[in-house]
Swiss-Prot record:
Protein EC: 3.6.5.-
The keyword Nucleotide-binding appears for this protein: yes
Function: A 50S ribosomal subunit assembly protein with GTPase activity, required for 50S subunit assembly at low temperatures, may also play a role in translation. Binds GTP and analogs. Binds the 70S ribosome between the 30S and 50S subunits, in a similar position as ribosome-bound EF-G; it contacts a number of ribosomal proteins, both rRNAs and the A-site tRNA.
Protein name per Swiss-Prot or TrEMBL: Large ribosomal subunit assembly factor BipA
Residues annotated for GTP binding in this entry: 15-20, 128-131
Gene Ontology annotations for the cellular component aspect, listed alphabetically: cytoplasm
One of the GO BP terms on file: ribosomal large subunit assembly
Xref: CDD domains: BipA_III, BipA_TypA_C, BipA_TypA_II, TypA_BipA
Subunit field text: Monomer.
Keyword check for Protein transport: no
Pfam families according to UniProt: BipA_C, EFG_C, EFG_III, GTP_EFTU, GTP_EFTU_D2
Stretches assigned to coiled coil: none
Taxonomic superkingdom: Bacteria
Organism: Synechocystis sp. (strain ATCC 27184 / PCC 6803 / Kazusa)
Gene transcribed to yield this protein: bipA
Amino acid sequence: MSLPIRNVAIIAHVDHGKTTLVDALLKQSGIFREGEDVPVCVMDSNDLERERGITILSKNTAVRYQDTLINIVDTPGHADFGGEVERVLGMVDGCVLIVDANEGPMPQTRFVLKKALEKGLRPLVVVNKIDRPRADPNTAVDKVFDLFVELGADDDQCDFTTLFASGLGGFAKESLDDDSEDMKPLFEAILHHVPPPAGDPNKPLQLQVTTLDYSDYLGRIIIGRIHNGTVKAGQQAALVKEDGSIAKGKVSKLLGFEGLNRIELPEASAGYIVAIAGFADANIGETLTCPDEPQALPLIKVDEPTLQMTFSVNDSPFAGQEGKFVTSRQIRDRLNRELETNVALRVEDGESAEQFLVSGRGELHLGILIETMRREGYEFQVAQPQVIYREVNGQPCEPVEYLVLDVPEAAVGACIERLGQRRGEMQDMQTSVNGRTQLEFVIPARGLLGFRGDFIRITRGEGIMNHSFLEYRPMSGDLETRYNGVMVAFEEGVATFYAMKNAEDRGVFFITPGTKVYKGMIIGEHNRPQDIELNVCKTKQLTNHRSATGDELVQLQAPEDMNLERALEYIGPDELVEITPESIRLRKVARKKLVKR
C-alpha cells in the first residue's frame, strides 16, 4: 500500500514566481490562522533573499491536502546555487517546473530542468503570471517542449502535464478557458502526477543528509529523506562518514514539517522528510543508518566550482577601523564554518598565512557569501575573480556560459559589438512586436566579468541579462574586459567639492565630497585607457575679495554607485575590493607610478 505522501520540488528560473506560488499553496492549505498577518514571499526567510527577491537556500515545508502530506521544497533558481538544487532533487519524487508566461524558458530554467531530467523526474509544467500584460502562455509551452527535447528528455518526460497559473492571483487552471479561482487544480495534479515515495519501512534505516541547520538548543540538525527503514526518537543510529568510517549516536530529537513549523514526531518511516538532532559531526551527503548493519547511500555528486577569488586580511590604511572580526584566524574559522553547509564551496590556503583561495559556482554565489560575512561584522579584502581552468584530453579548457539578453532594438548593435570583443558567439536573435530583441550567446565565463556595467550603460538600464554555466570548451584566446583606466587618490584626507569639481572632466567618480580617502584608493573611472592620480583633497584658497558674480550654485555629476556586485566585476588584476560592515572601497594592490595631475 502506497504512503499518503508526495515529495515535490519547485524549480524555475530566478524571478519566475516559485516562492510566490508556494505562498499561495501555503495560504490555501489552511496552515495560517484566519486574520494572521502573512508576509509576501514567506518562504524567503533570509534578509538577503527578501532584499534581492531570490531564493538562496532551499526551504522545506509541508501541507495536507485530502489526507495526503505534500512535502514541498522551494529551490534556488540561480545556477550559482546549484549545490542546493542538486541536493534537494535527491529528496523528491517529482517536480513542478515554473515558467514565466511572458519570458518563457530562460538560462536558469535550462539548468534546473537539466538536473531534474538527469534524476529521472517527470516535471509538471506550470506557466505562471498568465494575468500579466504581454503574457503569451501558448508560446511559452511550445518553447518548454523544445527545451525538453534539446535536453534529451525521454518520451514519458516530454509528455508533460501543463497548468496555467498566477501565484500572485492565487489560482491555477488546466486550460486557459477554465474559470478556476484557487490552487485546487495544482494540488490535484501533484497528487495524480507525482508518484508516492518508494522505499521499504521494514528494511534497515537509510537517510541521506541533504541539508544542515543549527539550533541554539539542539545544536546541529540534519535534514533529509528516509529512503528505507524507520527512525524513532531516542533510538541509537550510525552515521557513515565520507571516508567510510562510522560514528554512532542517539536520535535526541525527531522533527517533521508542517507548514512553516517543525513538529516533534515519535517515529517516521520511508518516504518522510525529517529533521534529526543528536549528530554534531554530520556533513552533507553522509548516510544515517542502522548501527547493526550500516548501509551507506551513494554520495551526492555536485558540479565543481568554476570561479575562484582570493580573500585576505585587510591591510589598507583604514584597516581595523570599522570591522568586528579582522584577523586571519577569524576569517579562516568563518570560511570553514561556511563549508559545513555550502556544499558547492571550496576553501584552500593562499600564498601566505593571511590569504585564502575561495572557489564557488559564480559571482553571485561568492558575492552572497561576502555580503553575509560583511553583515556579520567581518572586515577583509578580495582580489579579482578568476575563472577555473581544466585540462580535458590534454587540452586547456575554460568554462563557457549560455547568455540571454532582452534589449531595446536601439541597443542591439552595441551589445553584439561589445560581446564580439569579449569572444561571444551569437546563437540566435528574435525580435518581438513590442520593439525588444532577444539575443542568445555562448561566451567564455571570463568574457562576462565586468560586462554587466557595460550592459547597463549600453541599454540605459532597460536591458535584462541572464546567464548560466554551459560546459568546458578549449581556450579561446586573450581578451580585454575593461577599456578605461581608473582615477586614484594621491593622498590621504577628505574629498572636497572644490577639488572634485576641478577634476570632473577626467572621468566618473565613485565617491562624493566628504568621503574619506587614502593614497592608492580608487575614486573613479578615467575617461582614457591609462590610470591617473588625482588630488581630491585640495581645498579652495580663501581671500578677502568677493567674486564679481558671487558664488554661483554649482553641482557635481552624480557618482556611479559602486555596490558589492559592481565592485567585484569591475576590479582589474592589480586591484582589490576592501570590504567592511560600513564601506566598500576599491584600491590598488601595489602602487605603480601613475600619470599625475
